[in-house]
Amino acid sequence: MKQTVYTASPESQQIHVWSLEADGKLTLVQVVDAPGQVQPMVVSPNKEFLYVGVRPEFRVLAYRITPDNGALTFAGEAALPGSPTHISTDHHGRFVFSASYNQGCVSVTPLHDGLPGETITVVEGLEGCHSANISPDNRTLWVPALKQDRICLFTLSDDGFLSAQEPAEVTTVEGAGPRHMVFHPNQQYGYCVNELNSSIDVWELKDPKGNIECVQTLDMMPPDFSGVRWAADIHITPDGGHLYACDRTASIITVFSVSEDGSVLAVEGYQPTETQPRGFNLDHSGKYLIAAGQKSHHIAVYDIVGEQGLLQEKGRYAVGQGPMWVVVNAH
């Protein structure tokens, strides 16, 4: 398995393309000068395209991925209705979802042979809309509205339209600020990192009565932390055994173990990392974590070690200015 790491640096308007070697070392393959401030990125399900959200002209860019080394070639673009804070796709590669924090909306853009077309759906009124996360069954779009302490739930139709589910939302505690999400591989649980109180909510996707329930809320900060909480990103290992979340004020990555059924998290440790870690990701083998320091202008690679899933720094690399996003492709 070959793996490629992509990092987006909006201040220098660059995408760095790295080959992730089997021993965890990174080799620079390409630096792409992008037509704007590149921020959120996602790889298409078929591994053939990288989609990138850019500002200040709100667009989604499509880059074709070279199979042998992961290098990028520009392939197309489409306008977006709001400044892209987070982008994702459905599991079949038919649609791109874009969440806009500033414009408070989520949109659906169709993909034709991998290239983005004209937006077909926009849902507004989502204050602080921070991500769009398709459920494992490809039917429900979970959309955290950070400023409203709620996660809105939409049914995705076959033609890409969104309609409110029943229930239409789930709510967090006041002041939590739900931000980003991941789902357990067993498709039974979702995990949301809350930006404003740096906590993790564990959501049971459907209990026997068909309800969605928060079954655990866990603090992700060290007991002696007294600063302003400012959580950012969250990811889970491919086997579902460990979960990681980062806080930008403390510049740490918190390590969690996950119970076998996915319902319970336990803190295993806190890893100091690059200054102001806005984004990070895991490789597809579950062996390495790559974190980006928005204020250090570097990325760091960590070994994931032992049953606790603790992190050991393996290497550190300069990237562009203000790196904010990391994605990993396996091909």
From Swiss-Prot:
This is 6-phosphogluconolactonase. It catalyses: 6-phospho-D-glucono-1,5-lactone + H2O = 6-phospho-D-gluconate + H(+). GO terms for biological process: glucose metabolic process; pentose-phosphate shunt, oxidative branch. It comes from Klebsiella pneumoniae subsp. pneumoniae (strain ATCC 700721 / MGH 78578). Belongs to the cycloisomerase 2 family. Its EC number is 3.1.1.31. GO terms for molecular function: 6-phosphogluconolactonase activity. The keyword Ribonucleoprotein does not apply. Pfam families: Lactonase (PF10282). PANTHER family: 6-PHOSPHOGLUCONOLACTONASE (PTHR30344:SF1), 6-PHOSPHOGLUCONOLACTONASE-RELATED (PTHR30344). The keyword Hydrolase applies. The lineage of its organism: Bacteria, Pseudomonadati, Pseudomonadota, Gammaproteobacteria, Enterobacterales. Pathway: Carbohydrate degradation; pentose phosphate pathway; D-ribulose 5-phosphate from D-glucose 6-phosphate (oxidative stage): step 2/3. GO terms for cellular component: cytosol.
